[in-house]
């Protein structure tokens, strides 16, 4: 029998009659493939790639100057409303896309290995792969069986043949929403219109072959799109279809990426979507209206015959439901292969056999009805190109047709459609409408009876087959409406969405290469295709099929009913590959589905849209490591499934799988087993058992190397129109949401045994969706990105920590901290080196002589002032520097002494200050402060310096200095003129009086010292004053108020001998014998700033150059101008001021500065913040300053200058340490590739001056070994510390045999000593002191010691809505609470999961309560530091007004009444009244 005569449709020849003729030729197909595969070299390397698509959390710094998420009515843009792809630098970032291009060379090797494995496979191995089926017969024209379609080599040739053969036959029909025929074209009309389009495009637009154009048409303009695409094919123009539903950003990206200069559209579309937009203003893009081309005179065109490898179409799929943005390139060969293979499958339908009935319609012409627009790849292939090739008519209907009851059945009956192509979403609308009201279909029109007997195939586009719905369609819609063999008619069609929607498998009746006998073919192809699989085996990635007779042995939830697609289309092969090893899976295993076919388009690098950084994109096929052509390569489809009887079974998308690891005992060993779930089945079960759920999505995130599942569900009960006072039509909304989440969690536990971290409830149809194949589906990738960026529009969130916590490494049962005896014993066992952490003064440092020691103990700073005034009275003592007057001599030594004497006289007469009394110095001008403090020293008055940094922020300082005045019983307050004017203002004065009343104290008197007249008589009286006992070592001469960065205030008392000892250290180790001025006035209330401003210049006899802090912060170049003009060698500047001034500096004379300047000393009271230090280093490089000029120093309230980096720069003192080890109390330097993810610490000093430093265990009080963390203890050589009292850090004896009971002072700060190698000193190890946080700024949880500052900084980066420095974390009564200050009141519920996940992933800490407060609620100092103690006092007292609160651990709810007011936050506006506060601080009973 001739194979050509088989396709003669006038004969009713059965397929099995020609089986013997064809079966002999099947073996050559496999041999040909093996021959091709032997040409490829097999690689025996074990392939293992990180192709998993789980979420990775990465922490990134946001831009400091970026204005994001402001309050409402702001002129700035609210970036939370931007598309998810354009969110600037999300902190927790989904980083899968960056790896796609990097994996392509490896994927090419995997493809090569698959060919080698298939070519060498034997039948005994039972591997899951298929050999391509090849039709060993001519593919003839169904309308003309004597003509072979294989002779046509391009699409235009096919169109010309179809026009010549069937010119008047209907080609395409467009149906509107009401079912009326809008447009109908014949083949002749289509070609004529296409030539008219090509004539205008070539002669008027000037397009040449290879030019890329955009076709911009709406759904209702399908006919115009078809004509345009054929017109472009006539000229060899590359088509890029875009829909007006795409965003303008997508259009701009395509224009820029493809360098498009011309776009075709219609007049209506241009007027609606383009005319008044910014896209129209782009001069590089010209818009042409194709519906006006009929007005142009037709001119002859020069037709271009496209070759096989010429590009025909470039399809951008923007954010399909499961994949990122892709770019598929179609060639002529690709489309011809698709048309030939699809036609060879469709025409083998045995509809003309006995028992099948078919009406005649235009000489048995086939008709396809579909709702897929031709701009979609599937609609273009099946509805346009394959329609031309096979000669059938295509009816394009609107989506509303499927929603109208009875309309689809009417159209199928009217046009006698033989094929239909829909998706599940559209077909469900029609079927369910028929189930609810059959009369609307049966009596849709008078004298009309629905008859679907003409349907041969009802094709349904999907990735996962729904067997339950297939039965409903066949038994309850097709069969009642006249379809015979309805179960055979319903045909799922597998389209690879990763490749833009290319069909790769659907039902056909071609002979399978595996069916060697007639009865085997009939058994495999005509019986029911559904199989029953044990769900437990699928979870273990195995396939265990249950016979239908054994179904009673299992419960319904233990068995999964699955339906296949079919064999791969002709000329295609499928292999199931192991996800880890990349080997072909054996029968009974689940793996990745890899496809080999000429029908697949050429993929360019994916995620072009989501690649804003502009990384180099890799061409999948043009990669140099891919040594074979595309048609010889397997491609990863992104699906997971298996083969059974050579048919494809798909479980779901690889990106949508949810992994779970369970620990089980196997042979007395604890083993971890991997289980895999698929979100498709998970959401389907939840929707089945929880009727309140409309739709949802499930995905996984990775926290601390553990995988957690997150469910985001949509419920119609949450609507803004229904929410009113948290009530839903008489029912409590919260109770309803609790019921939904508990039911959903119960489903995941009972059926899937899946532990869920959190369940989020979103309003109806509010989750991010993407339009794909004509439907709106939830976009999993967008939901992941929105979840990680905290932008999901959820209204309720609930955590299930009890089920999720066992996966983490957190030991909840370990109540002992790192300072316990057991922990100390464990540390000693781990650390092998028995080296004590101790830093001694360098041996070359000279000891203090007895004369010098006697001088320090029996004299004061007043003696040095008198001596200097007597010897060099005309030498400059005080200099000032500003941007206008530059350097200016304010006072000489004689004039300075005279000013001090006049000030003393004023204090005696007006202030009436007595010796040993306390006076608060409240100054903004450093010169006036300098005079006042020396006047206090002369009178024996104890001064308490308090610097006013900004006059405008004085009102924020009132509470602080008022509390200090009460604590020390201050008798008077001395101020300068600017401070006095500010204090006399009505608001500040009333606030000061009210604060004194609240503190139950009498307001101290205020005296202005600016402009005191100079009196020569006062100098004579000053010489008669004898300080008396001021030089006594145990008497207090000064009280320093130290403000730490965390907001803490530490007052410290010093004697004159202590102050002189500090000055001596500065003179010997910093200034030396130089006579150059020293800079002061920047920070003059405490620490080294106080020494350099008020004392060091007098002690060393050098001038003091005063620079105001405000001037320096506003103009950082002022510092370098002062250094250059005065030839300064060493400068002291605090860390925060250094960062601000360096950032504002425009530049400097780097040559002069580097030659003159020796070092800029930056004292740090706390751990140097790495971000600030890095910023300083970057500014140093920008300015041109030598990097070794800036050096860090360790300061403490009890010792302003403990140690410093005398010989090394900041860059050499840094290192990365293991964060987990630091929390455990150990020190471990990370040297691997992951070191950049660990904390970066900068060393605080190597030179200890005259001090001895030890790292001491704070509980056991022994010196720690190297490798441990402990408390920093200091021993001073010069009696630098005062008496021990309640207001001062005290002294404590450290008893150790190796130490002769030396007196050490506790700093209260944690740290360690680590040895670094120095290349310039013969690799000698130098001890470096690294400081951590103060003990009161740490949390001990679950046996770990956490830094509050690190946790707060990490959580601040979670979302831009959180204010800078807007987090406060504290622990009270066993609960960990975090307060967040936010810009705007929106999407709080979406922030909760990512905040909790971030804390758990980065710091292994579990938050118990999260509360949000509006911006401006936190009390702050003028410098911006949070007043932590005052904020906590407001919270515990119930005075802190907050928006809403969320409890994470449900066991912290106190009573039933409290549960009813629990954690619900909606996207509506919040009421700030006390009655509507959801969680009150007093109810938590935290303190």
Swiss-Prot record:
Kindly report the protein's main subcellular placement as a broad class: cytoplasm
InterPro entries on file: AMP-bd_C, AMP-bd_C_sf, AMP-dep_synth/lig_dom, ANL_N_sf, Dip2-like_dom, Mug62_dom
- Gene3D superfamilies linked: 3.30.300.30, N-terminal domain of ligase-like
Pfam families for this protein? AMP-binding (PF00501), AMP-dom_DIP2-like (PF23024), Mug62 (PF24919)
Q: Which residues cross the membrane?
A: none
What GO molecular function annotations does the UniProt record carry, in alphabetical order?
A: catalytic activity
S-S bridge residues: none
**Which processes are annotated in GO (biological process)?**
acetyl-CoA biosynthetic process; meiotic cell cycle
Where is it found, in Gene Ontology cellular component terms? cytoplasm; cytosol; mitochondrion; mitotic spindle pole body
Alphabetized, the UniProt keywords read: Cytoplasm, Cytoskeleton, Meiosis
Which cellular compartments is it found in? Cytoplasm; Cytoplasm, Cytoskeleton, Microtubule organizing center, Spindle pole body
Please describe what this protein does: Has a role in meiosis.
Instruction: Report the protein name in the record.
Output: Meiotically up-regulated gene 62 protein
**Native organism:** Schizosaccharomyces pombe (strain 972 / ATCC 24843) (Fission yeast)
